[in-house]
Amino acid sequence: MSKRDLKKYLGELTKEQLEEQLIELYEKFAPVKVYYDFVFNPKEDKLLQEAKVKISHEYFPIKKPGAKWRPKAKMRRSVAQKLIKHFMMLGVDSYIVADIMLYNIEIAQTFSSQNFIKQELFYKSILNSFEQAVNFIVSNGIFNDFKLRINAIQNET
C-alpha cells in the first residue's frame, strides 16, 4: 500500500475507528509501543546512560559476583550501531545521538590504548564509526558543539 492510499484510507475512518486501530497497533507491535512510550515520556538522559553502559560493557565487561575471572571484551561495533539506529528511530535529539556516536569511538580508543589488538578490522570499524559520526554531526549543523571531542579523537589516533 502506498502512502497516498494509506492517507485516503485513514481519511475515510472516523475518529473512534482511528483510535481503535492505534490501540490495536500499540498492543500488537512492540516497536509501536516503544515509540509511543518514548513520545509521551521521553527520558533521553536515562536512555543515554543505559546506552553508554551497554557500550562500555562491550569493551570493559564487569566481573560477576563469585566469578573467578572478568569476562573477555567482545568489542562489537554492532551493539553501538543498533543503539544509534534505535535512537534515530525514536527521534532522539541529534546532540544525544552525536554524543553516543562519539562515546562509542572514545571508549574503543581507551580500550585499544590499554590492550594490544591484532585485528585490522577493529581499526577499520572504528574509522567507519568516526566517519559516520562526523558526517552525522556536520549534516545536523552541530559541528562547532562537538569540535573539541572530534579533534581529541583525531589526535588520539
Region roles according to the model:
Residues 1, 13, 27, 46, ...:
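Alpha-helix boundary/N-cap detector
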Residues 2-66:
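N-terminal interaction modules that seed assembly of large macromolecular complexes
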Residues 52-86:
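A broadly used, surface-exposed interaction patch
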Residues 64-68, 116-117, 139, 143:
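Charged, low-complexity interaction regions
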Residues 121-157:
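Eukaryote-biased recognition of C-terminal alpha-helical segments
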Residues 81-118, 122, 129-134:
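Extended amphipathic alpha-helical scaffold segments
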Residues 27-31, 53, 57, 78-82, ...:
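Generic structural signal for well-ordered, non-membrane alpha-helices
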